[in-house]
Regions:
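Non-ligating segments of multi-cofactor redox enzymes
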Residues: 1-179
Length: 179
Protein backbone atom coordinates (compact mmCIF):
# COMPACT_ATOMS: atom_id res chain seq x y z
CA UNK A 1 0.00 0.00 0.00
CA UNK A 2 1.40 3.35 -0.98
CA UNK A 3 1.41 6.40 1.22
CA UNK A 4 -1.21 8.01 -1.02
CA UNK A 5 -3.56 5.01 -0.65
CA UNK A 6 -3.04 4.98 3.12
CA UNK A 7 -3.90 8.69 3.34
CA UNK A 8 -7.08 8.09 1.28
CA UNK A 9 -8.18 5.34 3.68
CA UNK A 10 -7.46 7.47 6.76
CA UNK A 11 -9.21 10.52 5.25
CA UNK A 12 -12.23 8.41 4.30
CA UNK A 13 -12.45 6.97 7.81
CA UNK A 14 -12.21 10.42 9.39
CA UNK A 15 -14.94 11.79 7.12
CA UNK A 16 -17.23 8.80 7.73
CA UNK A 17 -16.84 8.76 11.53
CA UNK A 18 -19.36 11.56 12.31
CA UNK A 19 -22.01 9.91 10.11
CA UNK A 20 -21.47 6.51 11.71
CA UNK A 21 -22.13 8.08 15.13
CA UNK A 22 -25.71 8.79 14.01
CA UNK A 23 -26.40 5.06 13.80
CA UNK A 24 -24.72 4.17 17.06
CA UNK A 25 -27.02 3.50 20.01
CA UNK A 26 -26.67 6.32 22.47
CA UNK A 27 -26.06 5.33 26.05
CA UNK A 28 -28.45 7.19 28.31
CA UNK A 29 -27.01 8.86 31.35
CA UNK A 30 -28.49 10.89 34.10
CA UNK A 31 -31.79 10.68 35.92
CA UNK A 32 -35.48 11.00 35.09
CA UNK A 33 -38.55 11.91 37.08
CA UNK A 34 -40.78 8.98 37.96
CA UNK A 35 -43.68 8.15 40.27
CA UNK A 36 -43.26 5.62 43.06
CA UNK A 37 -46.55 3.67 42.85
CA UNK A 38 -46.35 2.74 46.54
CA UNK A 39 -46.34 6.43 47.55
CA UNK A 40 -48.85 7.78 44.99
CA UNK A 41 -52.24 8.76 46.45
CA UNK A 42 -53.94 9.50 43.09
CA UNK A 43 -54.53 13.17 44.00
CA UNK A 44 -55.19 14.30 40.40
CA UNK A 45 -52.22 16.71 40.22
CA UNK A 46 -50.58 14.66 37.44
CA UNK A 47 -53.53 15.51 35.21
CA UNK A 48 -53.55 19.24 35.93
CA UNK A 49 -49.97 20.28 36.73
CA UNK A 50 -47.88 18.90 33.84
CA UNK A 51 -46.44 21.62 31.58
CA UNK A 52 -47.61 19.69 28.51
CA UNK A 53 -51.14 20.19 27.15
CA UNK A 54 -51.77 16.46 27.81
CA UNK A 55 -49.85 15.09 30.77
CA UNK A 56 -46.80 12.86 30.22
CA UNK A 57 -48.11 10.77 33.10
CA UNK A 58 -50.25 7.83 32.03
CA UNK A 59 -51.84 4.84 33.67
CA UNK A 60 -49.91 1.64 33.07
CA UNK A 61 -51.11 -1.90 33.61
CA UNK A 62 -48.86 -4.51 35.17
CA UNK A 63 -50.37 -7.67 33.73
CA UNK A 64 -48.39 -9.98 36.05
CA UNK A 65 -50.37 -8.59 39.01
CA UNK A 66 -53.80 -8.45 37.36
CA UNK A 67 -56.55 -10.90 38.29
CA UNK A 68 -58.34 -10.39 34.91
CA UNK A 69 -61.55 -10.04 36.93
CA UNK A 70 -65.09 -10.00 35.59
CA UNK A 71 -65.69 -7.04 37.90
CA UNK A 72 -62.58 -4.86 37.72
CA UNK A 73 -62.73 -2.07 40.30
CA UNK A 74 -60.43 0.02 38.10
CA UNK A 75 -62.82 -0.35 35.17
CA UNK A 76 -66.26 -0.19 36.84
CA UNK A 77 -67.69 2.44 39.20
CA UNK A 78 -68.33 1.26 42.76
CA UNK A 79 -71.92 2.50 42.60
CA UNK A 80 -72.79 1.44 39.09
CA UNK A 81 -76.39 1.48 37.90
CA UNK A 82 -76.18 -1.87 36.11
CA UNK A 83 -73.49 -4.46 35.45
CA UNK A 84 -72.78 -3.47 31.84
CA UNK A 85 -70.28 -1.32 29.95
CA UNK A 86 -72.47 1.77 29.60
CA UNK A 87 -70.55 5.02 30.19
CA UNK A 88 -72.27 5.84 33.48
CA UNK A 89 -71.06 2.53 34.94
CA UNK A 90 -67.40 3.00 34.03
CA UNK A 91 -64.77 4.68 36.18
CA UNK A 92 -62.60 6.22 33.43
CA UNK A 93 -64.00 9.59 32.26
CA UNK A 94 -62.29 9.34 28.84
CA UNK A 95 -62.95 5.65 28.08
CA UNK A 96 -59.19 4.96 28.05
CA UNK A 97 -59.53 1.42 29.42
CA UNK A 98 -60.29 -1.19 26.77
CA UNK A 99 -61.90 -4.39 28.06
CA UNK A 100 -61.49 -7.61 26.04
CA UNK A 101 -63.09 -10.97 26.79
CA UNK A 102 -60.55 -13.76 27.34
CA UNK A 103 -62.65 -16.68 28.62
CA UNK A 104 -65.33 -17.02 31.25
CA UNK A 105 -64.98 -15.30 33.76
CA UNK A 106 -61.79 -13.48 32.67
CA UNK A 107 -61.28 -10.17 30.89
CA UNK A 108 -58.13 -8.36 29.83
CA UNK A 109 -57.82 -4.61 30.40
CA UNK A 110 -55.56 -2.40 28.26
CA UNK A 111 -54.85 1.32 28.58
CA UNK A 112 -55.25 3.53 25.51
CA UNK A 113 -52.49 6.09 26.18
CA UNK A 114 -53.94 8.56 23.67
CA UNK A 115 -57.12 8.82 25.75
CA UNK A 116 -55.57 8.61 29.24
CA UNK A 117 -55.46 11.99 31.02
CA UNK A 118 -53.70 10.79 34.23
CA UNK A 119 -56.65 11.54 36.49
CA UNK A 120 -55.85 8.44 38.58
CA UNK A 121 -59.48 7.37 39.06
CA UNK A 122 -58.86 3.87 37.69
CA UNK A 123 -55.71 3.53 39.79
CA UNK A 124 -57.60 4.48 42.94
CA UNK A 125 -60.36 1.99 42.11
CA UNK A 126 -57.89 -0.80 41.37
CA UNK A 127 -56.02 -0.18 44.63
CA UNK A 128 -59.21 -0.07 46.72
CA UNK A 129 -60.50 -3.52 45.79
CA UNK A 130 -58.17 -5.08 43.22
CA UNK A 131 -54.54 -6.14 43.08
CA UNK A 132 -53.17 -2.66 42.36
CA UNK A 133 -52.09 -3.66 38.86
CA UNK A 134 -53.04 -0.21 37.51
CA UNK A 135 -50.72 2.65 38.51
CA UNK A 136 -49.42 5.96 37.18
CA UNK A 137 -46.00 6.39 35.55
CA UNK A 138 -44.24 9.20 33.69
CA UNK A 139 -43.98 7.90 30.12
CA UNK A 140 -40.44 8.55 28.88
CA UNK A 141 -41.40 9.07 25.24
CA UNK A 142 -43.83 11.85 26.23
CA UNK A 143 -41.92 13.65 29.00
CA UNK A 144 -39.88 16.77 28.16
CA UNK A 145 -37.70 16.04 31.22
CA UNK A 146 -38.04 19.44 32.85
CA UNK A 147 -35.24 20.21 35.27
CA UNK A 148 -37.80 21.01 37.93
CA UNK A 149 -40.89 18.95 37.21
CA UNK A 150 -43.96 21.00 38.08
CA UNK A 151 -45.90 17.92 39.13
CA UNK A 152 -43.07 16.83 41.44
CA UNK A 153 -43.10 20.25 43.12
CA UNK A 154 -46.80 20.01 44.02
CA UNK A 155 -47.08 16.26 44.68
CA UNK A 156 -48.60 16.04 48.20
CA UNK A 157 -47.31 12.53 48.92
CA UNK A 158 -43.74 12.96 47.69
CA UNK A 159 -44.28 10.15 45.18
CA UNK A 160 -42.09 11.80 42.52
CA UNK A 161 -38.49 10.68 42.61
CA UNK A 162 -35.45 10.65 40.33
CA UNK A 163 -34.55 7.30 38.79
CA UNK A 164 -31.48 6.30 36.76
CA UNK A 165 -31.87 6.51 32.98
CA UNK A 166 -31.15 2.81 32.56
CA UNK A 167 -34.17 1.96 34.81
CA UNK A 168 -36.70 4.69 33.96
CA UNK A 169 -39.81 2.95 35.39
CA UNK A 170 -40.81 1.82 38.87
CA UNK A 171 -43.01 -1.27 38.87
CA UNK A 172 -44.93 -2.87 41.67
CA UNK A 173 -43.80 -6.24 42.86
CA UNK A 174 -46.14 -8.91 41.51
CA UNK A 175 -47.87 -10.91 44.24
CA UNK A 176 -46.02 -14.07 45.18
CA UNK A 177 -47.69 -17.28 44.10
CA UNK A 178 -47.87 -19.83 46.89
CA UNK A 179 -47.57 -23.44 45.87
Amino acid sequence: MTLRELLKVITGALLAAPFLQLFRKKEETGYYWQIDPDKCIQCGKCETECVLPRSAVKCVHQYASCGYCLFCSGYYQDKRIEFNTAGENLRCPTDAIVRTYVEDPYFEYKIDEEKCIACGKCVKGCASFGNGSLFLQVRRHLCKDCNECRIAKVCPSGAFTRVPADKPYIFRRPPEVKS
